[in-house]
């Protein structure tokens, strides 16, 4: 019987047939030392694993991912194109690098001279806010990669006002809109593309996935993630130095990761100084003989210091009682679990960092064991950082491939890296689920080896 991966439809929507010769001079010939065009019949499979004795296939354009890159024929006449760029959601290292790459490729490779920066996220397309449009030229974006944040500004929310947003796109007479944003922003991009199709407009919507949590499905790595690991590792190094310099010192570092613990996991492996890493995907007990606090006590007794790294979404089940108030916090206070979601559609979380800080302090006080705990939350220092060189390279390539896709009339898609190849991915497939750390996979196993923590910190009932 054929061994098939779970069925997904990776077909990419197009505005029509590409008939215009590309202004980029490339080749189809191997061995002539000229970069080659990419054909629309070049694909890769999202599933690499196979089992002996089982056949793989059949393959179609639906279960294969379309290769990204410049085509020989394009859909839009570059001299007629008006392109827009918008950044949505929170800050992330590399935003300006992506903007710069898009502008330079449009202007320098395709000859597109009308490029508009939409200010402050989706709200920049809404008439209520009346934000100015920022004309983008090579001179404007030349040095923007040297600073963090977003040249265009950003905001959360507004993406649910799809009709108003498409009205704004029409008012600006945009032919292409590049949407740089995370899961919530790309869900908005999907709705925008659907409304554009409903109106029978020839406007390309191209997403560039932005999430420092690295939780976009199918995408191997999100831009800014490598920079986040660099900065997070620096925070852990500081926590370790504080901990080992004190009597029974404990360093507690809270990192980003609402539903996926990739930053915490990679940081634990990279730092070589983390003794416990806690992520949303792996539940743990606080109390009891096999709980976190008992194991932390053993670590302090043995080595006289400890470092804990916790993702912001970890341990949420420990903080909520039947009344919706975090356990150990009868007054509610800063740990209270807020109902509903934020402007980006994310579920509001209780603060696991402050919760653990309090619980650790109470536990050792009751045990009459002196500790010196230092708590570090570097989240906004990480988000606003300038992209590391490895991320700058990635952002440049993401931006270039996004432009190539848009000029060919591709739409309702994002650019992603899969198996080290840039591909086109349909937005509706990407946003249907989030990527998580597999508790039974090799990454988490390696993290456990790096920290030396127990494989399971749950009490057997």
Swiss-Prot record:
Pfam assignment, any one: PFK
Claim: Ion transport is one of the keywords in the record: no
Binding-site positions, ATP: 90, 156-157, 182-185
Membrane-spanning residues: none
UniProt keywords, alphabetically: ATP-binding, Cytoplasm, Glycolysis, Kinase, Magnesium, Metal-binding, Nucleotide-binding, Transferase
Protein task: Catalyzes the phosphorylation of D-fructose 6-phosphate to fructose 1,6-bisphosphate by ATP, the first committing step of glycolysis.
Name of the protein in question: ATP-dependent 6-phosphofructokinase
Organism per entry: Treponema pallidum (strain Nichols)
Lineage, top ranks: Bacteria, Pseudomonadati, Spirochaetota, Spirochaetia, Spirochaetales
């Amino acid at each position: 019987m054929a061994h098939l991966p779970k069925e997904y439809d990776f077909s990419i929507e197009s505005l029509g047939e590409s008939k215009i010769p590309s202004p980029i001079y490339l080749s189809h010939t191997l061995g002539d030392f000229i970069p080659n065009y990419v054909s629309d019949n070049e694909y890769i499979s999202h599933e690499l694993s196979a089992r002996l004795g089982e056949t793989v296939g059949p393959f179609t354009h639906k279960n294969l991912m379309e290769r990204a890159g410049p085509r020989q024929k394009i859909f839009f006449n570059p001299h007629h194109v008006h392109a827009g760029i918008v950044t949505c959601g929170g800050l992330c290292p590399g935003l300006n690098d992506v903007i710069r790459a898009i502008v330079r490729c449009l202007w320098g490779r395709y000859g597109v001279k009308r490029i508009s920066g939409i200010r402050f996220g989706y709200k920049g397309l809404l008439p209520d806010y009346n934000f100015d449009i920022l004309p983008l030229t090579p001179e404007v974006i030349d040095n923007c990669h040297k600073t963090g944040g977003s040249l265009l500004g950003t905001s959360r929310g507004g993406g649910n006002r799809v009709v108003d947003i498409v009205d704004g796109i029409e008012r600006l007479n945009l032919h292409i809109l590049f949407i740089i944003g995370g899961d919530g922003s790309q869900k908005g991009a999907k709705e925008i593309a659907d409304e554009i199709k409903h109106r029978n407009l020839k406007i390309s919507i191209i997403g560039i996935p932005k999430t420092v949590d690295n939780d976009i499905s199918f995408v191997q790595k999100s831009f800014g993630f490598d920079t986040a690991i660099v900065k997070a590792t620096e925070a852990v190094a500081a926590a370790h130095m504080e901990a080992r310099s004190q009597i029974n010192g404990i360093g507690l570092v809270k990192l980003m990761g609402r539903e996926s613990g990739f930053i915490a996991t990679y940081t634990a492996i990279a730092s070589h100084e983390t003794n416990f890493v806690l992520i949303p995907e792996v539940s743990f007990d606080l109390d009891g003989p096999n709980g976190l606090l008992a194991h932390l006590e053993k670590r302090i007794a043995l080595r006289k210091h400890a470092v804990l790294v916790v993702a912001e979404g970890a341990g949420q089940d420990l903080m909520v009682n039947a009344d919706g108030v975090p356990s150990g916090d009868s007054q509610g206070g800063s740990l209270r679990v807020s109902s509903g979601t934020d402007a980006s559609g994310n579920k509001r979380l209780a603060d696991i960092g402050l919760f653990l800080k309090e619980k650790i302090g109470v536990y050792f006080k009751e045990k009459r064991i002196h500790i010196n705990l230092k708590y570090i939350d570097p989240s906004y220092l990480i988000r606003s950082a300038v992209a590391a060189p490895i991320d700058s390279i990635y952002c440049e390539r993401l931006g270039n491939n996004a432009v190539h896709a848009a000029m060919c009339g591709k739409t309702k898609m994002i650019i992603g890296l899969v198996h080290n190849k840039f591909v086109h991915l349909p937005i509706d497939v990407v946003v249907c689920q989030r990527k998580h750390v597999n508790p039974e996979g090799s990454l988490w196993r390696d993290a456990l080896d790096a920290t030396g923590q127990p494989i399971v910190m749950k009490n057997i009932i």
